[in-house]
Amino acid sequence: MNWRSERIWIELITGSRKISNFCWACILFLGSLGFLLVGTSSYLGRNLISLFPSQQIIFFPQGIVMSFYGIAGLFISSYLWCTISWNVGSGYDRFDRKEGVVCIFRWGFPGINRRIFLRFLMRDIQSIRMEVKEGLYSRRVLYMEIRGQGAIPLTRTDENLTPREIEQKAAESAYFLRVPIEVF
């Protein structure tokens, strides 16, 4: 969702609360829970899951390995659920032509740097840079080149934008900020 007028442009950034992250967290949780239950069933010698006959799985070495994979999967799943609940990566980009200021805000992991807030003047923006890598793992990322600060990404690296979408976004950003576009 974006909001735009002649002088102010606010672009909301979606963080980790995406449908794909919810799906992966659920799949990983259920799969690792199944592994842990089968490993525990082989240790106890009775079925905790009626779908799988776990008496056929001996505890050493198959049951231990399945329990290990189940515990590891639960840790990774809890990490995913934490990033979803904290909404890591969400925020906004605000371009204010009236005050001549650009503000970039993102939520991070809990701690000292939970709130990431960057603020700089529009006159320090040198260009909008488009980085395009084609191939098996194609990548299209839009950067804002800032004098003395380097390049700050405006799009996420996991966003699969089409060439037309990235060009349109680069053109809109460059037009609003009145800076040139560079392509790498």
From Swiss-Prot:
GO terms for cellular component: chloroplast thylakoid membrane; photosystem I. It is found in: Plastid, Chloroplast thylakoid membrane. Keywords: Chloroplast, Membrane, Photosynthesis, Plastid, Thylakoid, Transmembrane, Transmembrane helix. The chain crosses the membrane at residues 19-39, 57-77. One of its GO terms (biological process) is photosynthesis. InterPro entries: PSI_Ycf4_assembly (IPR003359). It is a multi-pass membrane protein. Its main location: plastid. Belongs to the Ycf4 family. PANTHER family: PHOTOSYSTEM I ASSEMBLY PROTEIN YCF4, PTHR33288. Seems to be required for the assembly of the photosystem I complex. This is Photosystem I assembly protein Ycf4. It comes from Drimys granadensis. The lineage of its organism: Eukaryota, Viridiplantae, Streptophyta, Embryophyta, Tracheophyta. The gene is ycf4.
